[in-house]
Amino acid sequence: MWHTAKITVDTEHYCTSTTQMAMAQMYGVIFDHEPKNKTMLCACPGTELHEMGARMVADLFENDGWDTIYLGAAVPKNALLESVRMNQPDLIALSVTMPQHLIDCKKVVDAIREEFPDVKIAVGGKAFESTDEIWKKWLIDLYTNDAREFLKRANEIVMDK
């Protein structure tokens, strides 16, 4: 909302940190589902700092029984690839809010596809909403701007190990 001058940057940061604290306090209360033996790695690639949506998606998957590896904001390509090597996720979810970070996201997608051609890749975030479905050209397995739909479709495309 700061980019439309509805609130200031400091107000946005305050609201974000308050929301993150509330989410963290709920963590032990809501995550009690049967494990699904599926792993999802979630990150904001490059210099993307807006991680709230990615955090919420990771928590939604965790609540559904997935193991989640949440790397957070501004994850460099090489660090993300190393995490994929170590954790061997079934699904990699990349979140981009600001359009200028789409280039970094594309580089990460290309690197993942080159080294891990069979892993499922999903993208999401506000930046993709005005791109005329650019994700379709990126060999992406899943895109939606709805978290519940994302979880439903992820469960369909990722089979049990």
Regions found by a protein language model. Name each.
Residues 1-31:
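Long amphipathic alpha-helical segments
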Residues 43-45, 95:
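Short hydrophobic segments within beta-strands
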